[in-house]
Design a protein with these regions (language model features):
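N-terminal nicking endonuclease/strand-transfer module with a His-rich metal-binding environment
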Residues: 1-217
Length: 217
């Protein structure tokens, strides 16, 4: 089954620019294009106007601060026989858990493992309440993820201890062997600078690209 994890942004790094930067990053056509069409959609919002939709909800309820968004990733194992369109549908079904919230859903097919990014508005447009992911909500989300994968007949795989606990940024960079890490780092920084509108967005995108997130299964 798929692994669900949340990108753990450091306190104080979320802003309007950071939210826009993350959206632009996950929506990139070079990452989402499959058979001539991007695997990008929205729950309660349109992908093209997702940033404005998120912001309008926040301004309506005067909750334009603190945690701006949650960033959930649903990943399938390397080499798994998963149709990208099925993976996108699985992510959409999981995103429906956040009823009343705008969710941008983007499936990336440019890596050896197919994965979907779900950017979730932290403010519910129906109630005006802020979303809080407590332990109970996370457990319910995990059960729903498993149920969706079973219903759709998606492959099951074992989660290793390393995958379950995730990797810190330091561990990630230590794992890069030889001299190639310097070139990889320079290329990564160049790509992040292209996608970022300002410093805040650059920091968020660089963190997203290089640091392994907190994994929850």
């Amino acid at each position: 089954m798929a692994i669900v994890h949340f990108v753990n942004y450091k306190r104080g790094t979320q802003s309007h620019a950071a939210m826009r930067g993350v959206m632009l990053y996950v929506m990139q056509e070079k990452k989402t294009a499959w058979e001539g069409k991007p695997l990008v959609s929205g729950i309660n919002c349109q992908p093209q106007s997702a940033y404005d939709d998120f912001l309008n909800t926040k301004l309506l309820y005067h909750k334009d601060g603190g945690v701006m968004f949650y960033h959930m990733v649903q990943s399938f194992p390397k080499g798994a026989a998963v149709d990208p369109r099925q993976a996108h549908e699985a992510a959409r079904r999981l995103a429906e858990y956040f009823g009343g919230c705008d969710v941008l859903v983007c499936t990336h097919v440019d890596r050896e493992h197919i994965h979907s990014h779900c950017v979730i508005n932290s403010v519910n447009f129906e109630t005006g309440k802020k979303l809080h992911m407590a332990k109970e909500q996370i457990q319910e989300l995990m059960r729903r993820n498993d149920a969706i994968c079973q219903e759709m007949g998606l492959p099951v795989f074992e989660v290793t201890a390393q995958q379950a606990r995730g990797m810190s940024g330091a561990e990630y960079h230590t794992a890069l062997k030889g001299q190639s890490w310097k070139l990889r780092l320079m290329n990564t920084i160049d790509e992040c600078m292209k996608d970022a509108a300002d410093r805040d967005a650059f920091v968020c995108i660089l963190y997203l690209t290089t640091c392994a997130p907190l994994c929850i299964r």
